[in-house]
A protein has these predicted regions:
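Bacterial N-terminal signal peptides
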Residues: 1-9
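Compositional signal for N-terminal targeting/processing segments
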Residues: 14-416
Length: 416
């Protein structure tokens, strides 16, 4: 009788979180099958033409250490040669490449040119204040300057210019169009229009597409508020070019859309990050199909907010996973030192007012000074909204809890 109860108790413990794999299973799989993140990406390019990389929070600057390291690898220029980003209107593609390929300029002159370009506005907000964009453009310029093979940058976002926006009504008209437009499908269409004009390298066209994770995943479904189907950029990419030609890879993050201002909803209730700790945080890349990582529930949205995805696993929305840095090392960085010059301030005030009157029509006061400070003053903070020590304690608690369950199950199963 005791043996029956013991087995029953062990089964109950094991079934407490049926959708969450064990730390042990995750660790063993990644330790055995994981390869270096760069090698993983280049391995995908051997069989596929397009790799969509789902980045974390746009503010996270740490992820661009890996991205720039990938682009700096000589294999990228030789075998791929083209990188595309969600950030940046397609209409600025030629101009940004002239900037990145300037050869007879000092670093000081380049930074002046970079700031002049950036002030034009790469997107439909008054200014893109995320520091990692400057980090990326500056890094790509340095890579191109050192190499005879230049990497071409394609900008895939909507065609937009602040020069064509003169009144609140102008901006409202554009803003309303965003809700009527499947931006994800346009991100794909803009990419496709540039991709088909690429010069093949060794007979094939290859491309790395960097876009935020909610856009990168592959998902389509009916979105009630818009009364129509909605497909993510990743879904459109696979539909346009085919499953085998497109591979979607996500960077490790947390279940950001479950964040309530206080918690830190780690993926798989924290077991992914605990497994990474067992590996001494050794970076790795793995496929997601038919393994404990892929079998973990996906708890995110599609397209940056239109709809929350239910009943799907990670292997249903992405092909691969890269762990490049532990969660507690992710850093959010906003503000670009000196971007708001005295000469540029009237223009940024104009844009800010148009934006605020459109996005916050009930507000009677436009917070000009606060906005300018956000654009102009560099600030860094943990991307998880919690300190490094707090995140480590949360991961340690997950480890301790699962060890206790494993020990209890083992003791019950070994009981006479």
């Amino acid at each position: 009788m005791f043996a029956i109860l013991a087995i029953s108790s062990a089964a109950d413990l094991a079934a407490q979180t049926p959708s969450v794999p064990s730390i042990k299973a995750l660790h063993e799989y990644a330790d055995k099958n994981g390869v270096s993140p760069k090698d993983y990406i280049f391995k995908l390019f051997e069989k596929s033409d397009i790799v969509v990389l789902g980045e974390r929070d746009h503010r996270d600057s740490i992820q661009y250490n890996f991205i720039l390291d990938l682009l700096a690898d000589s294999r990228f220029a030789e075998r791929v040669g083209h990188v595309y980003t969600e950030v940046g209107g397609i209409n600025l593609t030629e101009e940004v490449n002239r900037l990145l390929n300037a050869t007879s300029t000092t670093e000081s002159d380049f930074m002046d040119s970079l700031y002049a370009y950036y002030r034009k506005g790469e997107c439909f907000y008054p200014l893109w204040e995320k520091y990692n964009r400057i980090k990326f453009l500056k890094g790509l310029y340095k890579i191109n300057k050192k190499s005879s093979r230049k990497i071409h940058l394609g900008l895939t976002d909507l065609n937009f210019s602040w020069d064509s926006i003169h009144t609140v009504d102008d901006y409202k008209a554009f803003w309303k169009s965003l809700n009527k437009t499947n931006r994800d499908s346009l991100l794909c269409a803009n990419f496709a229009s540039m991709y088909e004009r690429q010069l093949p390298l060794k007979g094939t066209r290859k491309a790395l597409v960097i876009t935020s994770q909610p856009h990168a995943i592959s998902y389509s479904g009916y979105f009630k508020p818009w009364k129509r189907d909605y497909g993510t950029q990743g879904w459109w990419m696979k539909k346009t070019f085919g499953e085998d030609r497109v591979k979607i890879v996500v960077l490790n993050w947390f279940d950001y859309n479950l964040f309530n201002g206080q918690n830190c909803p780690m993926t798989g209730n924290g077991v992914w990050d605990a497994a990474f700790e067992r590996m001494a945080c050794r970076p790795f890349g793995i496929d997601l199909q038919d393994n404990p990582y892929g079998a973990t529930n996906y708890k995110g949205d599609a397209g940056g907010g239109p709809t929350f995805i239910k009943g799907m696993k990670w292997q249903d929305v992405a092909d691969g996973l890269i762990y490049d840095a532990p969660l507690y090392d992710h850093v959010a960085a906003i503000g670009i030192n000196g971007i708001i010059s005295k000469e540029f301030e009237p223009e940024i005030r104009r844009r800010t007012e148009l934006f605020w009157r459109t996005a916050h029509p009930k507000d009677t006061i436009v917070p000009f000074d606060a906005c300018i400070e956000e654009y102009n003053v560099p600030i860094t903070a943990p991307a998880t909204f919690k300190s490094k020590e707090e995140i480590k304690r949360l991961i340690q608690a997950v480890e301790a809890q699962q060890k206790a369950v494993e020990e209890t199950i083992a003791n019950l199963q070994n009981a006479p």
